[in-house]
Structure formats: C-alpha cells, structure tokens
C-alpha cells in the first residue's frame, strides 16, 4: 500500500514530506524532503522550528548553535520572519539576536548575543516592529558614545523615543568595626 508507506515515512522525526510512487513492474520511487532546522522552539527538549516556520520534534545528533524562539505556535511563521528581519537590521551593529520571544499578547522582545534585551512591543500598522528596530540601530551608537554603561534593556515601544535600563552596578560593602 503506497499510502501506508508514505505515512510511515512521514512519522520519522526529520521527514517533513514524503512522496511514494509505484514504478512498474515491482519497485517504488521515493522522494523525501527533510526538515531543515532554523531555530530551537520554546523550552521543550527537541522542539525545533524549520525553515518553513513549522514546529517539529527531533533530536539533533550534534548540537548546533541555533537561535531560540518562544511564543504561541500559531505565530511561529511570523516569528521566523521577525527573526530573519532582525538579523539583517542588526548587521550594522555587529550584533545577532539569540532569543526572540513573542508574548501571548503578541509583544516582541529580542535578546542579543551580548545579553542586551530590546523590547519592541506589538506589531502595529503605523509603526511595525521592523521600524522600531531600525530606529534602535540608527540611534544606539550615539547613545553608547555618551553612556557610562552599556544598557541591559532598551525599550523601543515609545512612538517618539526609547528608554534605557542599565544593569545595577555591583557594590561591595565591607563592614568596619569601630570603637564599641
């Protein structure tokens, strides 16, 4: 049964799609498309996102450094698009997004390879996430030149500006024992 063979092949974790054809007189022709992982999906072990934005479960034989995407599975293809745009937009800064999170309310957040978090907010027709990230790239070098510390969080959700949060400085307190 050709259909049973196809279904059996598609149950293999790395197989995205399989085509099976009967060849005369007594052979089968197989065409198999495998998943190409583009990102780790969520926090589940073995959950990956392929290049088509589809979530699948598989074990990687060798660990490969992939970005991590968290969010509602229904928006997985959009998230992959946001990630790809972010890679291109951040290129002038020499930064890469390592984690992209979309909240249940569809707010987008990036964690960059240096640990900085960039809050981008929700996708809006007048000010899409892409434009907010471009504004970050445009103004960040000037901010960095006058800032005493590199910000840990940049909040780009404001229409005409942005907010920075710097990491709290580590303070070492020593107890002095005076006269008693």
Model-identified regions with their sequence ranges:
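Charged, solvent-exposed interaction patches on well-folded alpha/beta domains
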Residues: 4-11, 17-180
């Amino acid at each position: 049964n050709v259909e049973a063979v196809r279904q059996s092949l598609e149950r293999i974790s790395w197989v995205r799609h399989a085509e099976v054809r009967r060849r005369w007189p007594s052979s089968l022709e197989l065409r198999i498309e495998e998943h190409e992982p583009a990102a780790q999906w969520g926090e589940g072990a073995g959950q990956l996102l392929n290049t088509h934005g589809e979530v699948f479960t598989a074990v990687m034989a060798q660990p490969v450094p992939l970005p991590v995407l968290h969010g509602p599975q229904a928006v997985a293809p959009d998230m992959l698009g946001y990630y790809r745009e972010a890679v291109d937009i951040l290129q002038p800064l020499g930064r890469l997004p390592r984690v992209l999170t979309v909240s249940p309310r569809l707010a987008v957040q990036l964690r960059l390879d240096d640990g900085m978090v960039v809050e981008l907010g929700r996708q809006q027709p007048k000010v899409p996430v892409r434009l907010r990230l471009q504004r970050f790239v445009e103004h960040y070098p000037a901010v960095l030149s006058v800032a005493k510390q590199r910000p840990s969080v940049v909040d780009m959700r404001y229409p005409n500006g942005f907010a920075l949060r710097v990491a709290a400085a580590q303070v070492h307190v020593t107890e002095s024992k005076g006269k008693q």
